[in-house]
């Protein structure tokens, strides 16, 4: 991945499951980009972690460099290909909310032919800004509608009504981004794996 950050230095992020192969590739990449002063970071993905956790780690690193533009080149084994594909789709889904733009995604064929550009990077789901903010609050531990109203005002400096939060939670449940568990007369919310993939971290 090539991360072109507005604030921090530009860098190439190499992702794989073998640290030896990544180190060799990192040395090669440093030579290719030596005149451009681009940093190279090698990230080894543990194949024992879940898909969601692997994507969360990478998404968090990229969002930590926002605002930025990202180019994702996909090659390697099935695990890396799957993780990077979901990363691309997650970033496109929430990029507008976190100042990350996915400029290009391409796949390198195993026969070492020409790269194949993705004609479109699909969104995992459509979200409004309010839905994304509420989902982020749930990731942060706000689980009841009344808590979310208070958390929304303190985190985003913007008031939101309880009925609006309740409608938003209903939409998030229908999109299978959160689950609601009855606690007395209220519903306690937690993210699903998909909700975690796109908003937590």
Please describe what each predicted stretch is.
Residues 68-76:
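Short N-terminal targeting/anchoring amphipathic segment
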Residues 79:
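Polyanion-engaging groove/track-forming segments
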Residues 1-69, 83-86, 90-201:
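Long, low-complexity, Lys/Arg-enriched
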């Amino acid at each position: 991945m090539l991360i072109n950050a507005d604030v921090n230095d530009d860098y190439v992020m190499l992702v794989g499951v073998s640290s030896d192969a990544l180190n060799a590739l990192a040395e090669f990449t440093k030579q290719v980009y030596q005149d451009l002063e681009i940093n190279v970071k090698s990230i080894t993905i543990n194949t024992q972690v879940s898909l969601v956790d692997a994507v969360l780690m990478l998404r968090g690193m990229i969002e930590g460099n926002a605002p930025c533009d990202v180019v994702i080149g996909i090659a390697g084994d099935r695990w890396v290909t799957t993780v990077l594909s979901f990363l691309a789709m997650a970033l496109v889904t929430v990029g507008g909310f976190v100042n990350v733009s996915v400029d290009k995604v391409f796949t390198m064929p195993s026969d070492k032919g020409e790269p194949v550009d993705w004609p479109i990077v699909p969104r995992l789901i459509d979200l409004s800004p309010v839905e994304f903010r509420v989902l982020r609050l749930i990731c942060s531990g706000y689980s009841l509608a009344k808590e979310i109203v208070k958390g929304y005002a303190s985190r985003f400096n913007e008031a939101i009504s309880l009925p609006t939060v309740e409608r938003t939670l209903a939409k998030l449940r229908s999109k299978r981004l959160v689950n609601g568990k009855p606690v007395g007369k209220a519903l306690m919310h937690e993210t699903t794996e998909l909700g975690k993939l796109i908003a937590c971290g």
